[in-house]
């Protein structure tokens, strides 16, 4: 999607050792959604945390591996968090549930920052939980660093999700609260200093992010968060949507994904820790219920994605409680010998059902031109005969969105790149030809047709109707 293209673009810029690029010649021909392009700067408008991680992928020529690696680390983080809070069995089941979530797997296949923040937030919770056991200063330093870096990745989500956990951890350490705050602040100093320095370089103010540079009418006040809409109206529209969509898209179980959480209402040891995780989940969902936008991205409500680690552990706790009740029932009817087999069958079902039902359905829907982005024209570039020195003019009925599929193919300085991909602007074609003289000039016309919603949780998909490569010179 356009957001992912913007993040990947900034990662490429960081990998080149730059904070931003010089504006290209004929800048209107390089405009892409969610990319800041003004008289002095060409860069992403998003926070710099995730592009820093993507830069490592660009260094090794594989930026597409960054999110899968981060998802793997997030899964291990759920195991670690579950082990610290409860026991190893809960950690294993929680990690398994996250690993088989179609929502998590499909989000992990793109350049969106939510997987990074899921990973960072989950590990931050793990070290905060460890710090409550009084094990030295290291957990506080690490959780401070991770929490602050989470702000550099997704500021609003980090504050909403981590604030309840931070408050609870400080209450648990209230006898040495000053020391705890000091270590947390020391750990978080470097990421926050980087964010403030980056913002200052980009906008002239440490708290003014690229969003505001791109659109000066924005701010990070509550009113701006709601974009002028009634907060109560937004909440009562969005909060039920979050609950409905989370119930249907995290795993796609036939009984619903949130219903098993009712087992957590049964009194049992560890319920305070359950409440700690639930507070983080609810704070994130409630907070973004006041946001102007509500969208489904990669098969689920993306503004709640960072809660999946905590939600997986809560589901694991609920399933284990249900398992204990089922085992007790088997004992009462003298079928206790089937306890182990029943537990194994239940785990296999929990693991395989999402992978065999919801995942193929959602993956097929996403295999179309999602948000009007498609790699198909570039796949046909070689067969069309496009040479190494070429100016490629991109046209089509959705070029405003589709051009993002070509943006990353440009060099960091299009003037010196062998191939240049620009939007075909007829009124500026002569200017483009003069600015980027290449041996060949090509035009690619991409025609897309919007599809009806294939299901309740995938939208903005298109079919490729035609791709025409034509050599102009």
Features from the language model and the residues they span:
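Transmembrane-helix motifs of polytopic, lipid-linked glycan transferases
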Residues: 63-86, 123-127
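Hydrophobic, aromatic-rich transmembrane alpha-helices
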Residues: 73-75, 166-169, 240-278, 282-285
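Transmembrane alpha-helix segments characteristic
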Residues: 98, 147, 164, 183-191, ...
């Amino acid at each position: 999607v356009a957001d992912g293209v913007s993040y990947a673009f900034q990662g490429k810029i960081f990998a080149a050792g730059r904070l931003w690029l010089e504006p290209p010649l004929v800048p209107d021909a390089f405009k892409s959604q969610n990319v800041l392009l003004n008289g002095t700067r060409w860069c992403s408008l998003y926070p710099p945390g995730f592009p820093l991680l993507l830069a490592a992928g660009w260094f090794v020529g594989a930026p597409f591996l960054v999110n899968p690696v981060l998802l793997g680390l997030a899964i291990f983080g759920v195991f670690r968090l579950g082990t610290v809070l409860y026991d190893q069995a809960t950690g294993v089941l929680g990690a398994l549930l996250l690993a088989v979530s179609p929502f998590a797997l499909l989000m992990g296949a793109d350049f969106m920052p939510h997987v990074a923040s899921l990973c960072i937030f989950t590990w931050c919770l793990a070290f905060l939980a460890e710090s409550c056991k009084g094990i030295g200063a290291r957990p506080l330093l690490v959780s401070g660093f991770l929490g602050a870096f989470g702000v550099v990745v997704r500021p609003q989500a980090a504050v909403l999700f981590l604030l309840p956990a931070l408050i609870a951890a400080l209450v648990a350490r209230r006898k040495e609260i000053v020391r705890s705050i000091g270590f947390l602040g020391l750990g978080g100093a470097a990421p926050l200093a980087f964010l403030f320095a980056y913002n200052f370089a980009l906008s002239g103010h440490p708290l003014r992010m690229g969003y505001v540079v791109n659109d000066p009418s924005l701010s990070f006040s509550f009113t701006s968060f709601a974009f002028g809409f009634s907060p109560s109206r937004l909440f009562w529209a969005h909060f039920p949507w979050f609950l409905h969509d989370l119930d249907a898209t995290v795993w796609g179980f036939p009984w619903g994904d949130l219903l098993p959480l009712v087992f957590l209402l049964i009194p049992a040891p560890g319920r305070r820790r359950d409440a700690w995780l639930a507070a983080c989940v609810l704070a994130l969902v409630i907070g973004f219920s006041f946001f102007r936008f509500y969208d489904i991205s990669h098969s689920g409500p993306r503004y709640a994605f960072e809660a999946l680690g905590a939600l997986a552990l809560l589901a694991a706790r609920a399933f284990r409680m249900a398992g204990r009740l089922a085992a007790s029932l088997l004992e009462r009817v003298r079928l206790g010998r089937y306890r182990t087999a029943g537990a194994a069958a239940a785990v296999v079902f929990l693991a395989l059902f999402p992978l065999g039902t919801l995942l193929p359905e959602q993956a097929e829907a996403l295999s179309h031109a999602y948000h009007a982005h498609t790699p198909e024209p570039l796949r046909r570039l070689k067969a069309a005969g496009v040479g190494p020195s070429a100016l490629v003019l991109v046209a089509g009925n959705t070029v405003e969105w589709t051009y993002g599929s070509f943006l990353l193919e440009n060099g960091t300085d299009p003037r010196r790149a062998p191939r240049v991909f620009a939007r075909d602007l007829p009124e500026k074609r002569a200017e483009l030809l003069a600015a980027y003289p290449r041996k060949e000039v090509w035009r690619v016309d991409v025609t897309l047709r919007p599809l009806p919603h294939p299901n309740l949780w995938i939208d903005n998909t298109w079919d490729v109707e035609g791709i025409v490569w034509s050599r102009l010179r």
